[in-house]
Amino acid sequence: MTELHPDLRENVRLLGDLLGQSILRFPGQDCYDRIEEIRAAAKADRRQESGSGQRLVKLLGQLSDDELLPVTRAFNQFLNLANLAEQYHGIRRKQGHPSDLMVESLGEVFDRLKSGGIDPQELHRKVADLRIEFVLTAHPTEVARRTLILKYDEMSDCLSRLDHDDLMPGEREEIVDRLSLLIAEAWHTDEIRHERPTAVDEAKWGFAVIENSLWQALPKFLRSLDTSLSEATGQGLPLQVSPIRIASWMGGDRDGNPNVTHEVTREVFLLGRWMAADLYLRDIQALRAELSMWQASDELRAEVGDSREPYRQVLAQLRERLIKTREWAEASVKGEPADDSGILFENEDLTGPLELCYRSLMECGLETIANGPLLDTIRRAHTFGLPLIRLDIRQEASRHAEAVAEMVNYLGLGDYLSWSEQERQAFLVKELKGRRPLVPRNWQPSEPVREVLATCEVVAGQTPEALGSYVISMASKPSDVLNVILLLREAGMAFPMRVVPLFETLDDLKGAPDSMAALYEVDWYREYCSGRQEVMIGYSDSSKDAGQLMAAWAQYQAQEKLTEVANRYGVHLTLFHGRGGTVGRGGGPANRAILSQPPGSVNGSFRITEQGEMIRFKFGLPRLAVQSLTLYTTAVIEATLAPPPVPKDEWREVMDWLTERSLRSYREVVRENPDFVPYFRQVTPETALGKLALGSRPARRKATGGVESLRAIPWIFAWTQMRLMLPSWLGSDVALEQAAQADRLPELREMMQGWPFFRTYVDMLEMVLAKADLRIASYYEQTLVEDEHLLALGQSLRQRLQGCIERLLELKQQQTLLEQEPVFAHSMKVRNPYTDPLHYLQAELLRRDRESEGAGKVPELVERALKVTMAGISAGMRNTG
């Protein structure tokens, strides 16, 4: 087993010691001793020392209500500090540890592509045309409070400063003192949110990720891309090219979230402009100090006359307009009268003066100055624009159909919802080709329809740079897309917006290619979309609907066929991947996922959701963000120029054979076994999850109901908390078992060797199985389940999990899980003694919580400690839902 890197081990030890000092100061020695005793017992239990498990459970059982909270908080804080140390270690560039970075450089990938026969001109063209868009979403998975995240970020900065070998003893002591203070502040800060964030709060957090990290990271990354591209092809990155885009669902995603109204969306658009103006003002102030030179081109002189400081004069005018823009946005947010004269609204208002200065400096031979901070600001302006972030709108298809139906009914044209698809399309295309407004002025729509129309009006008032995609969930036919375009036109939309159908259930994925072919058959629409189309693939719901193996295969086939259909109609397709942080929701290492997409499906453009806590893990610190941007960019370029081979027909047959068995066995348990939902409710903390104020979105679509009413995120969260990890392996166990019985494992090994898609699936399954824990799952059952039928189901599921592990080891010809991932294996080994006590405590607290609820009152300390265990286990697992 690979040990932790000495530097990482030293950082974990330092942070743990400083946390211990905080605990010694408060609550004091007795509590500290109790925590140490529990930690020692948990370590002994993991070493399988005789009687240590019973001793651990006994120690935890003896905790009084008053001791519960400090003990759970101590283990939660340690796991957060361990995450922090690991996250920092991933970006450490300390001399002698180049392997720590674990990301292939842009130059290495470009060289490999050229060695493989890619022409440098083709490489340059593909990079210049690259379009990678990250869509930040606030799914309720980020457990850590923003207050603490800021403290953790500064702790990471302290670790970075400690990495300098030339520190004087006094300097080192000063940094350690600051670290000690930050850890003490974190220890005395309540780590649990007690009120749900609003949709606007979530959007502000998205803006904060840009301000604190991406604002610095993006120009740094683009400099590196420019240099590597220039070295590889002889040409740098064109000035106006922005291969990276940042979009967001925070404040725009109203699907299943009644808290996101048109007022919220309008406020988020305005807040984005306010924040952007503020950030650009800081840049312009710094540039005014830099650009003091007097040489200028005739073009610039024509703009400013004989000024001795022509650049400063241009920047002073820009500064005045940015101040006006910020004041206008602030007044508009508050609902006060706002003067919009002289504000910056279109992107050219910002990029024009900056590029004028750039051209002048280049013409005067001042390239070094032109390519300094001015270039960084221009790159930011082309990436973030004046709106700062591109806001997506998401709404369910039936809401648009109902709006059109009310309109049609009011005009006396018939019952739209009873029309056939062909009748709907004929009506919509006729209206879209015409010029007349459809909505009469005196019409009074119902409240739900009024809200849909008001949202369309807010969207129509934006510039193209402020908008991402209009995503339609539950879309299945061309009229679903045409409804939205008509409603936007009625609202006054002056330019075509991307309208994106989302396919997420198994049936949706299977029907997606035919649905898109029918849409491309509409001549008017092909002209509207100008040969470009985006389609969203949902990973979470398909996995919950069909099990992970069937979902992964359905997603792969849908992407293949969608690409074929788009090519047939001469349409450039961008696939928008609605992935989560966990394997059960399509998560996993990004570069592996991209490189295992069907050949031809990436094609220079890639759009992906970054959800909840994964935003922090990937983009939370500037150096981390540069690393993530590099990783995605190299993978997208490679998948575009050197895609994986087309899978053999016999491999497809094997996948059909496997998934037929996995789907049947998954649904037999999840859909058809009457004991399953009661078992799920009793053995997991699902019902208590509603108490965690995680996000603005309700955890359920309906107040009651089975698994289908539960959102995909709490569904995964609940199983992760008690370590059965069921959504990610159920069904695969039977498929692998029957493959072994049919002597088909050699075929599967051949597929692993030659097919990145299948290899990635098997590797992700192994990672999930390594996080599962049979003993802990069994303890939850013993503590929380009494019904014999439910206990029998639990025993059967645990036996199936054990069987899945055995079959996977046989397939990979390994003795233990994660043999080829020693760093990850050791990370889990280090975390387990800290996570185990939280699991045992959580099961006990759930029991007390349920008993107290039955008696009518849950003690506050029990409820708070229960919330802390959920947060701590999430930190230990490095993900939630």
From Swiss-Prot:
GO MF entries: magnesium ion binding; phosphoenolpyruvate carboxylase activity
Superkingdom in the source lineage: Bacteria
Class in the EC hierarchy, top level: lyase
Pfam families in the record: PEPcase
Recorded catalytic activity of this chain's protein: oxaloacetate + phosphate = phosphoenolpyruvate + hydrogencarbonate
GO terms (BP aspect): carbon fixation; oxaloacetate metabolic process; tricarboxylic acid cycle
Keywords annotated in UniProt: Carbon dioxide fixation, Lyase, Magnesium
Entry EC number(s): 4.1.1.31
UniProt name for this protein: Phosphoenolpyruvate carboxylase
Originating gene: ppc
